Amino acid sequence: MAGSEQQRPRRRDDGDSDAAAAAAAPLQDAELALAGINMLLNNGFRESDQLFKQYRNHSPLMSFGASFVSFLNAMMTFEEEKMQLACDDLKTTEKLCESEEAGVIETIKNKIKKNVDVRKSAPSMVDRLQRQIIIADCQVYLAVLSFVKQELSAYIKGGWILRKAWKIYNKCYLDINALQELYQKKLTEESLTSDAANDNHIVAEGVSEESLNRLKGAVSFGYGLFHLCISMVPPNLLKIINLLGFPGDRLQGLSSLMYASESKDMKAPLATLALLWYHTVVRPFFALDGSDNKAGLDEAKEILLKKEAAYPNSSLFMFFKGRIQRLECQINSALTSFHTALELAVDQREIQHVCLYEIGWCSMIELNFKDAFDSFERLKNESRWSQCYYAYLTAVCQGATGDVDGAQIVFKEVQKLFKRKNNQIEQFSVKKAERFRKQTPTKALCVLASIEVLYLWKALPNCSFPNLQRMSQACHEVDDSSVVGLKYLLLGAIHKCLGNSEDAVQYFQRAVKDELCRQNNLYVQPYACYELGCLLLDKPETVGRGRALLLQAKEDFSGYDFENRLHVRIHAALASLRELVPQ
């Protein structure tokens, strides 16, 4: 049986739903699975779930589709029961795929060397590769569910699961490449006899070019994500990564995801979303392109332009349109897009929350603290992800509007909502809220705190010049010795965005020298070192000093807020420097 080649019978009870329409024709599994994922991305979450559940026992591919929807539901809600259900579903799919494997996985080359009847073995070859890719996909999602628990044993377990998945991806990727090469060789070697071709090459009635291309797309999604994610791991974790035998080639990762996104596999739309996520969220947040805050926008816009016709009602694609507009500093347009995405996601609470989060951030970028407060307060009350963090943002924005008494009440809630003890964001939120829990905050300090989170989340480059100047004025108005170092760090970052490099250098130097921040804001000095180092890299005569400051930020400080986040940025800055000036 070749799971990817089976056909579905016509349904008798068509109904009016999209799921019924998709299932009415005798589609192949691969086409049906792709239709289900497309349905999901066009806000047909229920219809997609219904389609996959109806056919989940017909083939491994449809079983995986049902398990993926279950996994997505768990990751969007973080509800314990849904996470357990997703684990059970993924394990069921994994067992289904293993049921006919018999524990023996021969390489394609061995099959050909043994001179087996390719016409007979080709369908099982396709089926086996499909099953192996699905097993690896299931293992990756099981590892993610394990990591969410944030326990040491879960991290170790997740790491070994990922190692198994990577080995399968790598082997399948090489096998499929070998099959494609053999197929091309067969097409070009016209001098071979018909019998010889049948003995040694992939024939048309065996493995079709279309099947090979779809399989390559299927494996390229996981293969590419591995490369891309591992390429961003900070140096302090590389030893563990190398021990597990993972790769990390950024360009290979992007190339594989592009291939997957253009394929006819069910994960093609997911590869598209992964690319949009990388270009509009990861690249700017981790400063993977140094001070070039608009790197990746052209690629993201091209992807959206190519795909928007296929997803006219997709809240997720509208969300990424808003992300692009925000990065281009078109905040009003971004707000319109996020509000549209919010309306499109009427039945998808978790996607609504992602949109609300962006609306809150865009409002903060505009210094519209009232609207920001409304968004974050709703998230605090509705979201299950991190009420502690949302409570902190709510309190900061409430205080920045001038309602300092109301803000103090919410600051007191932050500690009570602190649940994820190993989460850096929640640790930061609790630490920052502690001061205002004991004494009434001032409006000036709350405005400073809002600028601080804009800086830490790399949102200052999205601000307009007039708003940056207002922020600079707000920083100067703060007269509190306990936040002097923080004030200088923020002023340096603001002037850097305004293009005033000389002023920025002076402020960063003052922040580096401020010893009081070691008591109150431990992260200020290493972050100031990093910022100063990046500025000095821009001039040939100060490159050496800039590199020394980056190494100082990396090696001389530890135990501060968002340490791993800074290490990723330092790693990216040093890597780009090596590209320009080979060591």
Swiss-Prot record:
Keywords assigned by UniProt, alphabetized: Repeat, TPR repeat
The TPR repeat ranges on this chain: 315-348, 353-386, 485-518
Gene Ontology biological process terms in this record: cilium assembly; otolith morphogenesis
Keyword Repeat assigned: yes
InterPro entries documented for this protein: Iml2/TPR_39 (IPR019412), TPR-like_helical_dom_sf (IPR011990)
Ranges where the record places region Disordered: 1-22
Similarity comment: family membership: Belongs to the TTC39 family.
Protein name per the record: Tetratricopeptide repeat protein 39C
Organism of provenance: Homo sapiens (Human)
